[in-house]
Amino acid sequence: NYDGLFTHSTGRQAETMRIVHQVDNGRSLERLVSLDGSGREIVRTREEVHAYLPDRRVVIVEPRGDDGSLLKSLPTPGPALDRNYQLAVGPKGSRLLGREVRVIDVRPKDIYRYGYRLWLDEETAMPLQSVVTNGVGDPIEVIRFTQLQLKDTIPAHDIEPTVDATGFQWIRTGRKLAAMPQLPSKGGWRPGRLPPGFRLVASRLQPIPGSPMPAQHLIFSDGIAAISVFIEPG
């Protein structure tokens, strides 16, 4: 359980977010709030993810997939990771936010992937900072905690949305095609060639505004990086 502030930077754009994270009976609940600009909120419930967009007066609802917590996004050692990435663990002694951290570099072995540098809290393994790098090692995305409080309990109201959604349009999207991901049936679209290590990990139907027919949303991943493909009916 934790409550913190972090900055998310890409290029010349930066955003400050508050995150409140709770684990209840092994299931994570979460609320993200943008402290800049539109004030959007993302609430992860047990079954769904709700995105509140005040500037558009819209709430987007989609079924919850795998656990989207920070820990879930960490690379898992294994043959697939070893084939496509080189993992380097830094020495002890580094600190961030007054806490001991271990720096981990995840370096791609080809041109198809980005590199990653993670500052993991020694006690909890939480990433207190992460940097995505391009092929020459330049940072293209940075996520860094500026405040963090680890808590025994999180009040229920801290997970609830604060946006007044009265009069908002509710859009439900991302209906699953099947319980297990699978490629389109015979005669459908299939990838002709994927970068080494990538495989299909999710398959959903995505509504298209103004169209009665949904698009097919396929997600391919190598365990760290992910590629989305949208197929619209002709």
Give the label of every model feature segment.
Residues E100-I104, E141, P214-L218:
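Short beta-strand micro-motifs in enzyme catalytic cores
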Residues T133-Q149:
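Acidic, serine/threonine-rich low-complexity disordered tracts
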